């Protein structure tokens, strides 16, 4: 390996953020990117190091990375995080937190470069095989993939770890050794330390053959994407929900493929075959009068008006009152529901000087809303407006004193209607 396998056709810009742990792989990656920058002066290069706090050596690793980056004149961002147990297991949780930090650190126009290589690709394929994955899972990693509104590049994916080590030794590079990499209790370490050496002794080109299989799986998955694009368009609504009526006419295999692609579009974790079956049997085919719900981590799949919805789980707020002492400034809502603000220009009257302002999530009695004759209870209004059940006690209701003025994005009451041109609008940033 004498040059970086990255070329300008892979770049959406000339700005690169390199993931830099200080280990062998990322050290070789950063070294090659520094050489790339020397040959292309218009390239700007930064590095990011994640301090997980999992090792007693984590602080010394930060100092090592700072020294390397200072020597190579690469600006370094160090992100420190504390990992709480979220039920995913430490490997998955650390990876999730790491990539979340990458996404938050990327600047506009910047791409992320990571140091996965051919042996990593082989491990990823075998782990997916262990889980019983289909073509999508067995596609493993691509050299380029969408990430956080930009690109994630893996410019070393065709190189073996042995080749990377030869490069590092030849160029006198120094790297750290993470002691956790020697713990074969972790699945990936078990493959790297025990299984793959045995397989490669028998079949030296095993990783390359696995990479070819992963590429073929990826090609098959892209072909399925093309063939199912029309079906997917017919099934998905403007709100991103999935219409059930077309799915009812499909074969089990075709329907499962559509469900997987819809969930991928919603950035949901890829479901197992059993999970897909539960979605169909327990949610899609539930009784007409049921309100089925299936939890997936901090999200849910629900059915409403013959559509499937992928939503974030939020506890009902019907007993919550949020006082808005200064209504001219935005107000943060509980349970991650976002913010609301009153902005000039709209159909709501401004609060009178003696009226307190608050946000609530339930309203008693009979309500009279603008554009409708007669009064009706809030439950009836929600039904008429087609508001899904899980939004009915999480949609902000604006009160002046004890008077309901408006429901964000849904209705205005007669008592809340502006009488002049000095009205305001209730804007909800969920």
From Swiss-Prot:
Signal peptide: none
Gene3D superfamilies named among the record's database cross-references: 1.20.59.20, HUPs (3.40.50.620)
Main location: cytoplasm
GO cellular component: cytoplasm
Residue sites binding ATP per the record: 21-26
Record keywords, A-Z: ATP-binding, Cytoplasm, Ligase, Nucleotide-binding, tRNA processing
Protein's GO biological process: tRNA modification
Residue spans crossing the bilayer: none
Superkingdom as given in the UniProt entry: Bacteria
Major enzyme class: ligase
Reaction equation(s) it catalyzes: cytidine(34) in tRNA(Ile2) + L-lysine + ATP = lysidine(34) in tRNA(Ile2) + AMP + diphosphate + H(+)
A GO term for molecular function: tRNA(Ile)-lysidine synthase activity
Subcellular location as annotated: Cytoplasm
CDD domains, sorted: TilS_N (cd01992)
Family indicated by similarity: Belongs to the tRNA(Ile)-lysidine synthase family.
Protein name (record): tRNA(Ile)-lysidine synthase
Organism of provenance: Salmonella paratyphi A (strain ATCC 9150 / SARB42)
């Amino acid at each position: 390996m004498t040059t970086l396998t990255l070329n300008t056709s892979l770049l959406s810009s000339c700005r690169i953020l390199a993931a830099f742990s200080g280990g062998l792989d990322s050290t070789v990656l950063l070294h090659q990117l520094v050489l790339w920058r020397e040959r292309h002066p218009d390239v700007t290069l930064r590095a990011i190091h994640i301090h997980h706090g999992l090792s007693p050596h984590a602080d010394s690793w930060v100092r090592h990375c700072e020294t390397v980056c200072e020597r190579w004149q690469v600006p370094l961002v160090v992100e420190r995080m504390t990992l709480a147990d979220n039920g995913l297991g430490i490997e998955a949780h650390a990876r999730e937190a790491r990539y979340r930090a990458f996404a938050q650190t990327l600047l506009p126009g910047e791409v992320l470069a990571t140091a996965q290589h051919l042996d990593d690709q082989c491990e990823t394929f075998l782990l997916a095989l262990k889980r019983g994955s289909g073509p999508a899972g067995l596609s493993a990693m691509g050299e380029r993939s969408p990430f956080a509104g930009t690109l994630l590049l893996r410019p070393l994916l065709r190189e073996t770890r042995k080749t990377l080590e030869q490069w590092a030794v030849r160029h006198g590079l120094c790297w750290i050794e993470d002691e956790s990499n020697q713990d074969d209790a972790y699945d990936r370490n078990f493959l790297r330390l025990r299984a793959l050496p045995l397989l490669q002794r028998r079949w030296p080109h095993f990783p390359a053959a696995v990479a070819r299989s992963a590429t073929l799986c990826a090609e098959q998955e892209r072909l399925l994407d093309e063939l199912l694009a029309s079906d997917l368009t017919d099934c998905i609504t403007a709100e991103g929900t999935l219409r059930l009526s077309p799915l009812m006419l499909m074969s089990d295999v075709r329907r499962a493929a559509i469900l997987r692609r819809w969930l991928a579009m919603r950035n949901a974790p890829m479901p197992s075959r059993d999970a897909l079956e539960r979605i169909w049997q327990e949610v899609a085919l539930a009784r007409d009068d049921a309100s089925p719900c299936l939890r997936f981590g901090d999200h849910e799949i629900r059915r409403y008006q013959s559509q499937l919805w992928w939503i974030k789980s939020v506890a009902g707020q019907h007993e919550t009152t949020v006082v808005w002492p200064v209504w001219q400034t935005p107000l943060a809502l509980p349970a991650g529901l976002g913010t609301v603000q009153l902005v000039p220009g709209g159909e709501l009257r401004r609060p009178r000087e003696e009226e307190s302002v608050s946000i609530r999530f339930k309203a008693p009695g009979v309500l009279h809303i603008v554009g409708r004759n007669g009064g009706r209870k809030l439950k009836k209004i929600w039904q008429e407006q087609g508001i899904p059940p899980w939004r009915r006690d999480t949609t902000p209701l604006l009160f002046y004193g004890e008077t309901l003025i408006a429901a964000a994005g849904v209705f205005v009451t007669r008592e809340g209607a502006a009488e002049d041109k000095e009205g305001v609008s209730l804007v909800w940033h969920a």
